[in-house]
Amino acid sequence: MGIASLERDTKGGTRFTGCTSIREFEFLGKLGEGTFGEVYKARAKRDGSIVALKKILMHNERDGFPITALREIKLLKMLSHTNIMQLREMAVERSKGEGRKKPSMYMVFPYMEHDLSGLLENPEVHFSEAQIKCYMIQLLEGLKYLHGNCILHRDMKAANLLISNQGILQIADFGLARPFDEAPPQPGKGAGEAKRDYTTLVVTRWYRPPELLLQLRRYTSAIDMWGVGCVFGEMFKGKPILAGNSDLNQAQLIFSLVGTPTEENMPGWSSLPGCEGVKHFGNRPGNLAEVFKDQGPMAISLLTELLKLDWRKRVNAIDALKHPYFSTPPLPARPGDLPSFEDSHELDRRRFRGQRAAMPPAPAGGSVGMSRNGGWSTNSGSRTGAETRNPRISSAARSQGNQLRDAWSNEPQQAWQRRGNEELKDPNHSFSSRHRDGGLPPKPPAPIQHSWASGHSDKTGRDRGYGARYGGPEGSVDSYVPNYGGSDRNRDRDQGTAISDRRGSYYDKSHQTSKLDYSREIPSRRRSRSPNYRERVDRGPYRR
């Protein structure tokens, strides 16, 4: 087989066409902006189609093209499914001016009128149960395809689910996605067991599963299924169901809703790194059935399966699609039968927020994020790229981390149970519009060393014990990067796990968080593998 055969696809068309010029698009308006890039609505001149152009910002040009963008581009070009966002092409803008030496890059997506988060913020939008079932089936079909091809999304949330006025839902934002090494999930067997360590610097806090909060490194596709459960409940309530303002508060809300961990409902929880020094979280059964009592027993049953504390027994996408919830009246609506709504992107949502009733205060906490002028807006002073790559942290930061560890072990049980339950005991309780106005809670910031239980850097005795308990080699942590050629060693580093929280399909916003909530992982040199991507869609659950 000659090289020439790679230049044409199976239909004889050109396989690699390079980047389109930005002059091929007519800009129609701005949809949103954030730390990852700016997003514009545009019209393709060659065929008149409406597209979204996501401009990739180069905050540190000397570091080269952002690794998160490289990951997203590679995976999206390999994936092909009705419920997965399609990357049509890349566009380049070359400036003739002397002040701009490097071109600007744009990712070109089909235009989608909404993201799920925006629809839920629109006070004029109310989902019927048939509509919720339709969206859930499409979400589960997309995840079934992803997990069946050994891909973890790792940022499942309402803002990353795009919806068109034709009723089609698509999973977007693959900046944190990566292949996993284990076998794909099998019917009736959950997500299986992970055989290696992955970074815990993933998933937006409000949708983060308990095993990640407790620093489990050997996680599986079950982390995405927890996010599906959070989205499912959010569609019923019209607001995030677990909106914690810190990792500690997030765990409190989870345990108030689904019960505190025990060796029966979450075996091995006390051995996880995040539980060092914690003997118990009290003994509460949870009140999920009470919070969602208006949704009926079948919806509660599916929610219970999706929000299981034990990640080994959490339902996978294959089995979730077979749940009786989807075959009981009202049956799922067809996508084409769903109503259409006015556009709901970032700039549109600002108007919706002004229409919402007064709500409780926004979550508190430190602030880490990019300000409008590109600088770090943080309570702890400036933050540079060099700092994010430094494997050491200051003694002051370690001291604060130890205080956070003490909060887990020393805070009176009654106090956190009472505070966590206040948000959940009232089904009609409203969340502050500023929860969204200030952006969703962030993806984890650039890695720093985790210091809850130790002031030592890199591998401690605790880390070695953890690796031995779970049977894995030390330092075998997630550092997936796209398999591009070249000898640039910087491309072998996992630098892009969480520098920003994307606020939707095409864009993201600055966020507020404490950089002590997260741990430092040790990068390795693992290369990617391209799975066999084939679309397999079962439309059986839809109403005929």
From Swiss-Prot:
Its EC number is 2.7.11.22, 2.7.11.23. One of its GO terms (molecular function) is cyclin-dependent protein serine/threonine kinase activity. The active site is at 155 (proton acceptor). GO terms for biological process: intracellular phosphate ion homeostasis; positive regulation of transcription elongation by RNA polymerase II; transcription elongation by RNA polymerase II. Residues 419-438, 456-466, 488-511, 532-544 have a biased composition (Basic and acidic residues). Residues 357-544 are annotated as: Disordered. Its main location: nucleus. Residues 25-326 form the Protein kinase domain. Keywords: ATP-binding, Kinase, Nucleotide-binding, Nucleus, Serine/threonine-protein kinase, Transferase. The keyword Kinase applies. It is found in: Nucleus. ATP binds at residues 31-39, 54. Signal peptide: none annotated. GO terms for cellular component: chromatin; nucleus; P-TEFb complex; P-TEFb-cap methyltransferase complex. It comes from the Eukaryota. It catalyses: L-seryl-[protein] + ATP = O-phospho-L-seryl-[protein] + ADP + H(+); L-threonyl-[protein] + ATP = O-phospho-L-threonyl-[protein] + ADP + H(+); [DNA-directed RNA polymerase] + ATP = phospho-[DNA-directed RNA polymerase] + ADP + H(+). Residues 374-403 have a biased composition (Polar residues). Serine/threonine-protein kinase involved in transcription regulation. Phosphorylates the UBC2/RAD6 ubiquitin-conjugating enzyme (E2), leading to monoubiquitination of histone H2B and the silencing of telomeric-associated genes. Also required for histone H3 methylation. Necessary for the recovery from pheromone-induced growth arrest in the cell cycle G1 phase. Belongs to the protein kinase superfamily. CMGC Ser/Thr protein kinase family. CDC2/CDKX subfamily. This is Serine/threonine-protein kinase bur1. It comes from Emericella nidulans (strain FGSC A4 / ATCC 38163 / CBS 112.46 / NRRL 194 / M139). The lineage of its organism: Eukaryota, Fungi, Dikarya, Ascomycota, Pezizomycotina.
